[in-house]
Every structure is written in structure tokens, then in C-alpha cells.
Amino acid sequence: MINDDTIVAPATAPGEGGIGIVRLSGSGAEKLLLKFFSPRRFCERLDSHFLYYGKFTDETGKIVDEVMAVIMRKPRSYTREDVVEIHCHGGGLLVRSIIDVFLAAGARLARPGEFTLRAFLNGRIDLTQAEAVIDLIRSRSNLASDVALSQLEGRLAQQIGVFGQVIADLLAQVEAAIDFPEEDIELDDQQMLGASAGALIADMDRIIDTFESGRVLREGLRVLIFGKPNVGKSSLMNGLLGEARAIVTDIPGTTRDTIEEDLVLGGLPLRIVDTAGIRNTLDPVEEEGVRRARSKVESADLVLLVIDGSQEMGEDDLLALEFCRNREVLVVINKCDLATLPISSALDGLPYVRTSVLEKNGLDGLVSAIQERFVHNAHVAENRETVVLTQRRHRQALVKARQSLGRFRETLVQGMSPEFGAVELRDALDAVGEITGETTPDDILERIFTRFCIGK
């Protein structure tokens, strides 16, 4: 699957900028560099990992740009191939011109993620580290980048390696019983094997349980502000954003469509959605706003049900509560500066916070409540040793391995032939191997690397 042809792509985002970078990788990268780049000071051979200033010309000898160039000879490069970078003046035209020169000379335009794919295929990184690269690029908060860096440093791969080694040790003992049937596995040995598998299952469960927190850090949290009209929903959105994004008036029904904004609160990337007030109405425009608000409930990770704390809950409050009854709900009892009434029995069992958005009171408590609800592993920011799952693929593979280990324990309990146990252990070993890329099918690899941008 490894292709040694020379690939080229822009390594910087399109558009104007101070610097544009063109990257090459492959056996012909250095030859192509020397064909079109002339260092200002003559040298017989460019040293690896040194920047050289000079001129870049096309095939006719016309100067394209004054550039800085560097060659990183294998294996001390990102791909473990010869890698060349041209640092030119920023701007799409210059970057495209340099790429066109290399393409005309025999290089090939890189596919999305192909540089990282080559790093994986050449053994520089495993699949979890490759996935961490794109997570790091796309991270929207410090917590998310810390988790991605931990994975890029190999923390997840190390943990998966431990799991794989324990499974391999169990398999070796079971296969010994198959190869030497005259030496039956004694009861004590069976109990030891079962206990080892049980301990491994418990360790896997602890890692699996981190997925929801990791998913939120990686993908962000979709938070819906919901409730009847004039309870302070738009004021709450403006308070969280720190700016007057939504129109606020004393007239019920001012918000008639959804308003969405991205922000980071307490290390959490959020997509905040303000909605029309929920009530029965004859106004067709407002009615459409209510319908859209209801439709957003199903896709929300969290519904902030806003209640006017200075009034008793009414029919419209109960209607809004019913619409989000089966979702993750955090009740925001607003306007507590006006009055503090007892909590309605309709809210029994639901978590709540008290706020006065206009007085800017209670917002920190709201953010903390959201964080505690969804990120149980927030300490990863301070401790890179913590392993947190961020990919559904990783969770699915660990669940599959865990299930195989459970069936292996059952073969011991039932006194079944060791061949049955060996099958389950091999399945478990294959499952954990999928995470790091040891046993990953090509179609999964393709899906992973096509998520990358060209040039990475």
C-alpha cells in the first residue's frame, strides 16, 4: 500500500497571509527542490533540517519568488521519507505557481491526509496518533487540544498496548492447553485466567466510560435554550456570549426563529441555540418559530429549560417541560432578583440552577453545572497521563473486545473446550488491534484519512 512517488500540496490554508508553505514528500523530493531552488550562497549539498534563503524559478528560469527552503531527509521527517518545504510569500497565486512547477516536473498532487497516511504506513505513528493530528487541528478549546496532545504523545496507544499484551498472554496459556491436551487446565488455573480477564474487563470499562466526555470535548456540545416567552432566554444567550446577539424586549414572542452561535465556556466548546418562546399561538409566524424550536429539541445534547423564578409555573411552562421531558435537561430558574418562589413539584428530580441574567448573577454556576454534567474527566487538562476516548471507532472496538472477553470467561465457567476460549481471545486481540491500526481494514483507513485536509 506504500507508494514511493513524490507528492506535493500546500501546507497552509488558502488565501492571503504572511507566509505560504508548499510541502513535498517522496524519493524525488530533494531532486525536485534542487532543480528549481538556488540558495543565495553556493553550497555543494544542502544540510538536512536547515533553512536556506534563495530564489525559486520555473522551468524557463523565470523567478517565481524569493523563498526559504528546507529538506528533512528520511527517516527524520514527518513521513519518514525525504520531505521538502518551500516557504514563500503568502498568497494563493504564488503557492499555486510553485505547486504547478513541481507538478509539471513529475510530482503528484497529494490526496487529503496522504502525508499523515505515509507517516502511519511507514511506522512513524500509529492510527490513534494519526487521528489525534486532525483532532488537534480541529480542537476548539484548551481541554480538547490537551486531550488530542495526550493521544498524539501515545498515551492511548500505550494503554491499548497493555490491553493487547494481557490478552496475548491469556491466549498463550489457552493455546498451550490446546497443544498439550494431556495437561488439562487445572481449576486453579481456570480461576486465575477468569480473574485476569475480569480485571481486564474492569480496566476497559473505565476507559469506555470516558467516551461521552471525550466526544463532547472533540465535537462540542449542542445546547438549546428553551422555554415559554419572556422568561429571559435571549438575555441568557447574550449573557453567555458576552454580547447583545439576540434582540431583547418586554414583548412576548420577540424571538421567532432560532439563533445559533459558537463559544467556549469553562473549556467546553458549545453551540448555543436560542429559540422562540413555547406557547399556543394563532400567529402563523410565531407558530412556525415554535415548531422550529420543538424540532431542535431532538438534536440537542442539553436543553436549558428557562423558568421565570418570580412567577408560579403556568400552562406554557408545563407545555415546554413536556416537549423536553425525555431529553437531557438543566432547569434555569431565572429572574431570581425579583422573587424566589419554592421549586414547583413539576420539576421534581430535575437538576436546576438559579440565575438573574440581567444582574449577571448565577452564570458561573450555570457553566459549572454544564461542565460537571458532561465532562467528568476535565482533569485531563492538568494530567496528560489520563486516557480519554474521543472517537466512536475506539469505543466500538473496546466494547467488542470486552464482549469477547466476557464470552471467554463464560467458556471457563461452562468447562468448554479451550478451543472455544481461544476463538474469543483472538477476536478480542483483533478488536484492540483495530484501534492502533494493526488489524484495521483498508476501508476504515480510507474513511479516517479522507477527513484530513490536503497538505496534512
Curated annotation (Swiss-Prot):
Keyword terms, alphabetized = Cytoplasm, GTP-binding, Hydrolase, Magnesium, Metal-binding, Nucleotide-binding, Potassium, tRNA processing
**Which residues are recorded as binding (6S)-5-formyl-5,6,7,8-tetrahydrofolate?**
R23, E85, R124, K456
The positions annotated for binding GTP are 230-235, 249-255, 274-277
Record has Metal-binding as a keyword = yes
InterPro entries, per this entry?
G_TrmE, GTP-bd, GTP-bd_TrmE_N, GTPase_MnmE, MnmE_dom2, MnmE_helical, P-loop_NTPase, Small_GTP-bd
A GO molecular function annotation here is:
metal ion binding
Where's it found, cell-wise?
Answer: Cytoplasm
Q: Which residues does the UniProt record annotate as the domain TrmE-type G?
A: 220-375
Main location group: cytoplasm
User: Which terms does the UniProt entry file under GO BP?
Assistant: tRNA methylation; tRNA wobble uridine modification
Entry note: cofactor: Binds 1 potassium ion per subunit.
Give the Enzyme Commission number: 3.6.-.-
- Reported cofactor(s): K(+)
Its EC top class is hydrolase
- Binding-site residues, K(+): N230, T249, I251, T254
The UniProt record lists the keyword Iron-sulfur: no
List the CDD domains hit by this protein, alphabetically. trmE, TrmE_N
Instruction: Output the Gene Ontology cellular-component terms.
Output: cytosol
Summarize where Mg(2+) binds, as residue positions.
S234, T255
Which family, according to UniProt?
A: Belongs to the TRAFAC class TrmE-Era-EngA-EngB-Septin-like GTPase superfamily. TrmE GTPase family.
- What is the protein name given in its UniProt record? tRNA modification GTPase MnmE
Native organism:
Syntrophotalea carbinolica (strain DSM 2380 / NBRC 103641 / GraBd1) (Pelobacter carbinolicus)
What gene name is listed for this protein?
mnmE
